[in-house]
Each structure stands twice: as structure tokens, then as C-alpha cells.
Design a protein with these regions (language model features):
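Left-handed beta-helix
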Residues: 90, 98-265
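Unchanged
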Residues: 1-149, 257-263
Length: 265
């Protein structure tokens, strides 16, 4: 609280760290100001079968929230919180202090803080977000989000929009070497790689080496991985700095409609 107080902000944006999306926060802030809200929560409609994974809210026609429950066992709505909030700082500060002083509180944002603000009659509004959004809190959803970057018309497109910057801690690396004998289709290859094998529908992160005769399909390869000749990787996530030895087989294929079980190394 002291850190934020030194900037004396009127509003504070609270975000989750395991979600993938692109959003213009300025547009959400304009909505927040227009509705004279104390708190605005980004929402989207989810299937009822998945609603128990999210904070679920009921809203009036004007978008105001009159009910909020974190991960309900029996959800009464499909309006799911995306973990993106804008608060009046004075309001958030008050309830954070009160929550910390409450010995019965679990100190949980969704279970305690948001319901407390709502119960005291403050103005909470839902801001509907239509774009791509994915919670990558599971292995399968992390794999799916990476696969969504691929293809001619990807579900999550990193290109084609001016002004969108990607901030990362990657070191500056040389251009990748893509050997003439390599076979690559529908893949994303970052800088600093040496590619001699076959890669299909996969993400190859910085500094990776794929030797001649190695096969990578439908997989996510984290930075600085070396995949030796003859290794076969399918439907897998390989952690950074791994070495996949010659002839190793990781993962497999799935029948249509079969649940995808992603291998992890």
C-alpha cells in the first residue's frame, strides 16, 4: 500500500499473471469513469460447465454487478471474471486494510475483498471483453495457448496491429540458422536457433538446436533446448535447458475426440 500511495493515484489496475490476452486498458478506464464506478471487472461469457473455475457475477441491464461469488459450486450465471480490475484507489486501499485486520478473512481477493466492497453498496460494473483470453494455469491450457499462435489465421494473432509491444527479458541473439535440409511447416522459430531436423506445428524458443533426423510435432520447446538426432517429440512441453538424447521418444498422437494429455519434460 505504501508503494502505491507514494504515486497518489486516482485509479489502480489489478491484473492476474497467468492470463494470455490483448486489451486496451485505456478503453476499460474510460468505461470505468463513464459509469462512475468504484470497481470495474472485465468479464466474458463462459460455458456453464466451466463456470465453477471462475469468479462468477450477476449483472443488471446497465452492467452493474449485484452478486459475485468466487468459483461457485453451483453457478447461477455464466458471466466470468477475467481477473482484470480497475479500482478507485481510495476504495481499494480501505478494503485491503480492513481485510488485513479481519481475523476471519482468508485474505483472498475474489472470496473476500470483492464481495466486501459489493456488500457495502459500492458501485461495481462489468466490462465485457470480446477478444482472445486464456487462463494458462494448467499444463494443457499453456500448451493450447501456444498452439493458438500458429497458423495462417491464428486464434491469438501477435501480428498486424500497430502499437502493440511485447516486453520480455530475452537476450539479444543472432538470427536463427534454418538449414536447407530441414523441413519446417507451420511453426514459430525464435532467434538464436539452429534447425536441421523436421518441425511441424510447434513453438521453438530462443537458443534451441534441433539436430538432423530429429522430429518435433505439436509441441512447445522452451529456451536453450538441444534435441539430438533421431529424437521424436509429439504433443509435449520441453522445459528450458533440457537435452533430449538421441533416439528418445516423448509424447504421442491422439485419436479424434480423445482427451489430449500433454507430456512434460
Amino acid at each position: 500500500i505504501g508503494f502505491i500511495d507514494q504515486y497518489q493515484p486516482e485509479y489502480v489496475v489489478i491484473l492476474s499473471g497467468d492470463h494470455i490476452y490483448k486489451m486496451d486498458y485505456a478503453a476499460m478506464l474510460r468505461y470505468h469513469e463513464q459509469m462512475e464506478a468504484d470497481c470495474t471487472i472485465a468479464v466474458r461469457t463462459v460455458p456453464l460447465a466451466e463456470a465453477s473455475r471462475f469468479g462468477i457475477m450477476n449483472t443488471r441491464e446497465d452492467g452493474s454487478i449485484y452478486e459475485f461469488e468466487e468459483k461457485p459450486k453451483h453457478p447461477t450465471s455464466t458471466n466470468a471474471s477475467l481477473g482484470i480490475y480497475i479500482f478507485k484507489w481510495s476504495v481499494l486501499k480501505k478494503f485491503l486494510i480492513e481485510d488485513e485486520e479481519n481475523p476471519r478473512s482468508e485474505n483472498d481477493f475474489g472470496k473476500n475483498v470483492i464481495p466486501a466492497i459489493l456488500n457495502e453498496g459500492y458501485r461495481l460494473f462489468a466490462y465485457e471483453f470480446q477478444g482472445y483470453w486464456k487462463d494458462v494455469g494448467t499444463i494443457s491450457s499453456l500448451w493450447e495457448a501456444n498452439m493458438d499462435l500458429l497458423g495462417k489465421n491464428p486464434a491469438f494473432n501477435l501480428y498486424g496491429e500497430k502499437g502493440n509491444r511485447i516486453y520480455a527479458r530475452n537476450y539479444a541473439m543472432p538470427s536463427s540458422i534454418i538449414a536447407r535440409e530441414s523441413k519446417n511447416k507451420n511453426c514459430f522459430i525464435a532467434e538464436g536457433c539452429e534447425i536441421y531436423g523436421t518441425i511441424t506445428h510447434s513453438i521453438i524458443s530462443t537458443g534451441c538446436t534441433v539436430d538432423s533426423g530429429a522430429i518435433v510435432e505439436d509441441s512447445v520447446i522452451m529456451p536453450n533446448v538441444h534435441i539430438e538426432s533421431g529424437a521424436i517429440i509429439r504433443h509435449a512441453i520441453i522445459g528450458e535447458d533440457c537435452r533430449i538424447c538421441r533416439g528418445a521418444v516423448i509424447g504421442g498422437s491422439f485419436a479424434p475426440g480423445e482427451e489430449k494429455k500433454i507430456s512434460v519434460v
